[in-house]
Amino acid sequence: MPKVRTKDIIEQFQLELVSGAEGIYRPITTSDLSRPGIEMAGYFAYYPAERLQLLGRTELSFYETLTPEEKRARMQRLCTDITPGIIVSRGLDVPPELIEASERQSVPVMRSTMKTTRLSSRLTNYLESKLAPTTAVHGVLVDVYGVGVLITGKSGVGKSETALELVKRGHRLVADDCVEIRQEDEDTLIGSAPELIEHLLEIRGLGIINMMTLFGAGAVLPHKRISLVIDLELWDPEKQYDRLGLEEEKMKILDIELPRLTIPVRPGRNLAVIVEVAAMNFRLKRMGVNAAEEFSARLSDAIEEGERD
């Protein structure tokens, strides 16, 4: 799992570090946040100390009603050796008892001018993106008519050449050769290129070319949701290929199954056009239009009419 540290949160959201600077390299292992309201009342039985703690106006206004002894006790229990950080929102004053306890336990205390709800939402989205399960797939990812198409297949089958032709036809390259994929949701896979090979495409005989330099910024994308997998394979005359499109193959990446099409490759086939049509047909299916099923229904009706005659 990728590591996120408190220091990354400070830099990403431009937080003010108030105290506990020694702990800014503590790891953040979950995207869940905690607003320790009931803990301020003294109930720590289920205190999620491993989460980022977020203190807003509600928590701090209740905190001000406590006695000095209770204030010190609450903050000492709030700051543990596994707490990645405590953030005070709305630019509110940080209680001196919190500063004292955080320095003792090296728990970073930060302050943000954002409203609590907005800060919570942005933190959650950022952490879910950074802590999402990841994998890498050998292939090419292209944005075709707004559909993220992952082109797979053995080396030399023509994946990069197909991507080059697609870019020339106005589509956008996301990644070539190695596609880093992260699962951001129960049904969402996001693909991107490793930083080392971003915007680069390898063509046998030409070498490595920079697609952004060659075709402009509109020819590339930093990341794209993957919706369709197209597997290119050399034409096997002994194999029966799907000619109707009624049976839908699936490919599982991480915990998500994606629709997959197997396209046989042989000289004379325009793969770029086939990929374009596959992407458009995929969009039509999502809109409820399935040409294969319509043909099958018409064929069944024709057979029934013939039998009656």
Curated annotation (Swiss-Prot):
Q: What is known of its domains?
A: The Walker A ATP-binding motif also binds Pi and PPi.
Residues noted as binding ATP in the record, renumbered to the chain:
G153, K154, S155, G156, V157, G158, K159, S160
Q: Which domain of life is it from?
A: Bacteria
Return the EC number.
2.7.11.-, 2.7.4.-
Assembly and oligomerization: Homohexamer.
Quote the protein name from its UniProt record.
HPr kinase/phosphorylase
Organism phylogeny = Bacteria, Bacillati, Bacillota, Bacilli, Bacillales
Q: Which miscellaneous remark does the UniProt record hold?
A: Both phosphorylation and phosphorolysis are carried out by the same active site and suggest a common mechanism for both reactions.
Active-site residue list: H138, K159, D177 (proton acceptor), R243
Coiled-coil region(s): none
**What gene, per UniProt, encodes this protein?**
hprK
Check the record and name the InterPro entries matching this protein: HPr(Ser)_kin/Pase, Hpr_kin/Pase_C, Hpr_kin/Pase_Hpr_N, P-loop_NTPase, Ser_kin/Pase_Hpr-like_N_sf
Pfam families reported for this sequence: Hpr_kinase_C, Hpr_kinase_N
- The residues listed in the UniProt record as binding Mg(2+), with positions renumbered to this chain, are S160, E202
Q: Family, per the entry?
A: Belongs to the HPrK/P family.
Organism of origin is Geobacillus thermodenitrificans (strain NG80-2)
Summarize the protein's role: Catalyzes the ATP- as well as the pyrophosphate-dependent phosphorylation of a specific serine residue in HPr, a phosphocarrier protein of the phosphoenolpyruvate-dependent sugar phosphotransferase system (PTS). HprK/P also catalyzes the pyrophosphate-producing, inorganic phosphate-dependent dephosphorylation (phosphorolysis) of seryl-phosphorylated HPr (P-Ser-HPr).
Name its co-factor(s).
Mg(2+)
Region of interest (Important for the catalytic mechanism of dephosphorylation), residue spans: 264-269
